[in-house]
Regions:
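Contiguous, well-folded functional domains in the mature portion of proteins
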Residues: 1-161
Length: 161
């Protein structure tokens, strides 16, 4: 049966945790580029695992040459940046194993990368991993229902509407 409630329901995007761990406020990240939202708003994760997954279905728009950051665009053009760890760019790719390629379509919760935390632990500022949404891609949409605290990969941690 057709439901008018669903027809008129505003489209929203469920954002899944990309990793097991703890979700924290973006303003609590130990880097002013992220905590002052210079690149955009979002949430950060303190990983308790080494596997990172896609927070929603979309297309991989960028993989930094150092394999520590991934851009993903949803079909609605909302785009996020998953930045794994802080100051990880200095590792020049060491400790990061990408599982996707630029231009590849991914499903929600599909494996993006594996990180060898034990190999890089003493060489990074923090393993805090911001998941930010590029302001130009939101176009009037906002991030809501942010879940902080313990999270599992694949669990809904925010809604964009």
């Amino acid at each position: 049966m057709f439901s008018f409630g669903n027809f008129f329901k505003k489209k929203q995007i469920e954002i899944l945790s990309p990793v097991d761990g703890e979700a924290i406020n973006i303003t609590d990240v130990d880097d002013e580029v992220f905590n002052e939202k210079m690149l955009g708003d979002g949430v950060a994760l303190i990983p308790a695992a080494n596997e990172f997954y896609a927070p929603f279905a979309g297309t991989i728009t960028s993989i930094f040459p150092t394999n520590h950051a991934y851009g993903i665009q949803h079909r609605t053009k909302v785009e996020c940046l998953l930045h794994i760890g802080l100051d990880t760019v200095n590792l020049k790719g060491r400790g990061f194993e990408p599982k996707v390629k630029q231009g590849q379509k991914v499903k929600a919760n599909e494996l993006l990368a594996v990180v060898n935390w034990s190999e890089i632990a003493g060489e990074i500022k923090s393993n805090q991993s911001p998941l930010i949404f590029l302001p130009d891609s939101l176009k009037g949409k906002k991030i809501t229902n942010i879940k902080l605290g313990a999270v599992k990969a694949g669990e809904v941690i925010a809604i964009i509407q």
